[in-house]
């Protein structure tokens, strides 16, 4: 891959052989010069811009910092700082899904720590694939987008996993103790990742479908409400943890357990206060924080909550002390299997991931000052979706749930004006190192539920807003309002009352028929799957109303409407 300097005025593509290849000797000389000179190590970048808070009495600098394109030379220190900023921006999103999924299965703390470590390592390794972009030999196809797009664990799988686990505990796939509490069930996690590995083939096939066709089949009026329902179904998880945890909500129980350092009843004011502290800290970072604080405000809020919780005695250090010094992929394994009822919902997850990937990479290209139309752009989209699918297969084999392209990092690019891939590589390296040090994962697992709940509530609400932003791209005609109403009515209902379809089918002793009925039941009790199906069906059969064509002005959908965030930045500086 040629990483030579390109002009920021023209398209910055990664087409092979676009520049003469350098010899190994020339590359070594350039690297040595980059690492041994002040220009290469520090440069003349205004580092104060990243750390300067926006306080009311401080004078704002009207000058915009320089823009670093995809392949431009960038100082080593700046690449590391911005890589750290990208890593912090995605940290909460990377560790939250494995924490929720492992808690749903009552997995022991050592397995939870392993999954958090593996999540960080896998995200770092697979993000490198997405950022680098590989050409498939003797084909017009690529693997990877070639831009600063990072991979993270998909939130969409949490709702499917939660419903499937409930079904597994009720049908005997997983066991309960005499009191009705869930026993650890690693077999269920193996079924989840095994089914995901098979269903990821759907997204791989979608990568070879032209993006325009995908967007026609899954327009914003379909994907928007689906993403909204994913976030809505997860907010309840955050609120339960905010009040102490989902496993101790019954009367007379203490949270998180009777053996915890400071056990309290669910909903105690101490728990509410800790979560509220995290929530308020996030707001204060966004209002008064420096650019580097704004992009990682969720992590800073979590850190503030952890400090106060530790000072008040809510932390348990036993698991941290018992954790190994290092961890890696496959240190622990799970028995892989395919759970039939999960197939259809997980296929829906990968379709949503493909649609999200197209939108995220389009936004990344725009803020990176790259073309957002034409052959090169379409090849980036194809490579990104293909990398999404392949990475999900690899992630499943590495004991991790499905992966998707993260959108948080587009905000970091727009804010810092750095789209350089070397900042992305530094981000990947930081994630991998953080995952290898198992004590870091153990510290995350030991964070009190109320602190995590305040962070999760904010994080999952941002998923809802992302869905609303997608819906806003479609004109609000009568037809679209009807599709939204019908699809979200059933989706909301299934989310609020997830057991509404549980007694429709009679009991049967036919195992094959029971498996088919369980699959239908799981789909209809998963809110976002219901919304996606109804929206797709109505969008296909509902004709456009002639009197509304041209009468409604669509909201702008082009990513050029806020080119690389510069207009937003300048408006803030004014």
Curated annotation (Swiss-Prot):
One Gene Ontology biological process: xanthine transport
Keyword tRNA-binding among record annotations: no
Keyword Transmembrane: yes
Effect of residue 409 to Q: Increases affinity for xanthine, but not uric acid, 9-methylxanthine or 8-azaxanthine
Functional summary from the UniProt entry: Uric acid-xanthine transporter.
PANTHER family membership: PURINE PERMEASE C1399.01C-RELATED
Name under which the protein is recorded: Uric acid-xanthine permease
Organism listed in the record: Emericella nidulans (strain FGSC A4 / ATCC 38163 / CBS 112.46 / NRRL 194 / M139)
Gene that this polypeptide is encoded by: uapA
């Amino acid at each position: 891959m040629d990483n030579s300097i390109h002009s920021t005025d023209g398209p910055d593509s990664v087409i092979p052989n676009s520049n003469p290849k350098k010899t190994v000797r020339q590359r070594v000389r350039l690297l040595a010069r980059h690492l041994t000179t002040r220009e290469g190590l520090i440069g003349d970048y205004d580092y104060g811009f990243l750390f300067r808070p926006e306080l009311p009495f401080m004078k704002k600098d009207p000058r915009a910092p320089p823009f670093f394109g995809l392949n431009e030379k960038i100082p080593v220190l700046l690449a590391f700082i911005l890589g750290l900023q990208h890593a912090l921006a995605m940290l909460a999103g990377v560790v939250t899904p494995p924490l929720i999924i492992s808690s749903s299965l009552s997995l022991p703390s050592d397995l939870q720590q392993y999954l958090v470590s593996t999540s960080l390592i896998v995200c770092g390794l697979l993000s490198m694939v997405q950022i680098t972009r590989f050409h498939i030999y003797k084909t017009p196809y690529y693997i990877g987008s070639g831009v600063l797009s990072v991979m993270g664990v998909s939130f969409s799988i949490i709702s499917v996993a939660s419903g499937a686990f409930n079904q597994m505990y009720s049908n005997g796939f997983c066991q309960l103790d005499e009191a009705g509490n869930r026993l650890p069930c690693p077999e269920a996690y193996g079924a989840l990742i095994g089914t995901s590995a098979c269903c990821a083939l759907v997204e791989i096939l979608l990568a070879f479908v032209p993006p325009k066709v995908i967007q026609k089949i899954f327009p914003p009026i379909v994907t928007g409400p689906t993403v909204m329902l994913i976030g809505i179904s997860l907010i309840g998880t955050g609120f339960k943890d905010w009040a102490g945890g989902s496993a101790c909500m019954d009367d007379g129980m203490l949270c998180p357990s009777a053996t915890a350092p400071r056990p309290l009843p669910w909903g105690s004011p101490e728990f509410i206060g800790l979560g509220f502290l995290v929530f308020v800290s996030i707001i204060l970072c966004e209002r008064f924080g420096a650019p580097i604080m704004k992009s990682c405000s969720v992590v800073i809020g979590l850190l503030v909550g952890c400090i106060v919780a530790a000072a008040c005695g809510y932390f348990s250090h036993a698991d941290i002390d018992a954790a190994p010094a290092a961890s890696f992929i496959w240190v622990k394994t799970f028995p892989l299997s395919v759970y039939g009822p999960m197939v259809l919902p997980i296929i829906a997850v990968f379709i949503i991931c493909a649609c999200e990937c197209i939108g995220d990479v389009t936004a990344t290209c725009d803020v990176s000052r790259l073309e957002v139309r034409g052959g090169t752009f379409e090849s980036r989209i194809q490579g990104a979706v293909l990398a999404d699918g392949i990475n999900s297969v690899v992630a499943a084999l590495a004991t991790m749930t499905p992966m998707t392209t993260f959108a948080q990092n587009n905000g970091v690019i727009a804010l810092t004006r750095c789209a350089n891939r070397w900042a992305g590589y530094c981000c990947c390296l930081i994630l991998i190192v953080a995952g290898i040090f198992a004590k870091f994962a153990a510290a995350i697992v030991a964070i009190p539920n109320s602190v995590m709940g305040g962070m999760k509530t904010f994080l999952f609400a941002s998923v809802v807003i992302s869905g609303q932003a997608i819906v806003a791209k479609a004109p609000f005609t009568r037809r679209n309002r009807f599709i939204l109403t019908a699809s979200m009515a059933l989706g909301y209902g299934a989310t609020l009352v997830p057991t509404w379809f549980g007694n429709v089918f009679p009991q049967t002793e036919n195992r094959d028929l029971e498996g088919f009925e369980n699959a239908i039941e799981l789909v209809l009790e998963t809110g976002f799957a219901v919304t996606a199906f109804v929206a797709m069906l109505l969008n296909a059969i509902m004709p456009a109303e002639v009197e509304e064509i041209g009468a409604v002005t669509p909201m702008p959908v082009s990513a050029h409407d806020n080119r690389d965030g510069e207009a937003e930045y300048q408006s803030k500086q004014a």
